[in-house]
Amino acid sequence: MKLYHGSNVPVNVPDLKHSKPYKDFGRGFYLSADRKQAVGMGEQKLSQIKQGSVYVSTFLFDESVMTSGELKVKIFDDYSEEWVNFIIANRSYDRKQPVHDYDIVYGPIADDGVTYQLRRYEGGVISLERLLTELRYPKGITFQYFFGTERALKCLKRI
């Protein structure tokens, strides 16, 4: 399958040293199966950095790796209490990072709207049930792939 990475620079060889901590699934290389979503991520990066251009780098990924047992993989098929706790742990500046040892994680993106809702939940403003209800918006869920180890990155082939 093709996976896409949006940024303000082209990425020919992904490496973890350019990855920032405290992201949804931790420090890693993030991709999407949706090219349009990757373009949006590139636009977002460009607006933050204010230099470069929008680039979408394309990679081939043999998705059988997700179930082969070769790598440690975590899959979140939907928003759930486990997903909420995983995102909160990875984004927490108060916890020792990394908080997990997965090679690859697949699951919903916590975009800006989700981040706001997570803060409300953490602050006790809304319950977990209310949070999960609010996360299910009409546009549907957007998913991301996280590659967090060198072993995982070796599964990506730039095209």
Where are these regions (language model features)?
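Glycine-rich loop/turn
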Residues: M1-F29, K36-S47, E82
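Ordered hydrophobic segments in well-structured contexts
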Residues: M1-H5, F29-Y30, V56-T58, Q144-F146
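Conserved NAD+-utilizing ADP-ribose enzyme module
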Residues: K23-D24, G40, Q44-I159
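Short linear sequence elements within intrinsically disordered, low-complexity coil regions
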Residues: V9, Y30, R35, S64-M66, ...
